[in-house]
């Protein structure tokens, strides 16, 4: 592999949603630099951070209907039974896996399963810290129901304290593949996945999640949730 190919393969693509933000940071840096040169370098660092925030790396997604894949990068903040948002019309408790994204996480959201999108519902709300449990019901959110081979799976994008703009380009009705990009949330947020109770979690609270790659749950398995060790 040539040096040019090595450099090219090391560069992570930037999602189009970030272009105008990066341009604004760049123009602002130049203007501030005209006033005082050190401000230009500070602005340049912020521009680089903005570009890093909107990165859109390729992911290697396991393709198996039994597997549920992480919807986002971040930290698993909760795993356990919970009621889905009422606007989804899903009755009873589901198994919820929540992934919290901080401002340094890649904020592209991906489908955890394949299937038909039967519903997309946006609800206004508060902008509490997305890491709080009550944010699931009180914060602004955008929800999808995916009719998977093992039943309905709900994916909820939740706005956070800083992130106040949810983007979803999926459409209902429509088909979606596991690991497929369907949206993003700007500047720190959370994604909840609600699974039928027969799904067995394969992650623990505090575990690092890689969107489109980490297996967070499995259907058709009687194995208990994994034991974990912090070391």
From Swiss-Prot:
Catalysed conversion reaction: a 1,2-diacyl-sn-glycero-3-phospho-L-serine + H(+) = a 1,2-diacyl-sn-glycero-3-phosphoethanolamine + CO2
GO MF term set: phosphatidylserine decarboxylase activity
Highest rank taxon of the organism: Bacteria
EC number, UniProt record: 4.1.1.65
Keywords: Cell membrane, Decarboxylase, Lipid biosynthesis, Lipid metabolism, Lyase, Membrane, Phospholipid biosynthesis, Phospholipid metabolism, Pyruvate, Zymogen
Job description of the protein: Catalyzes the formation of phosphatidylethanolamine (PtdEtn) from phosphatidylserine (PtdSer).
Stated name of the protein: Phosphatidylserine decarboxylase proenzyme
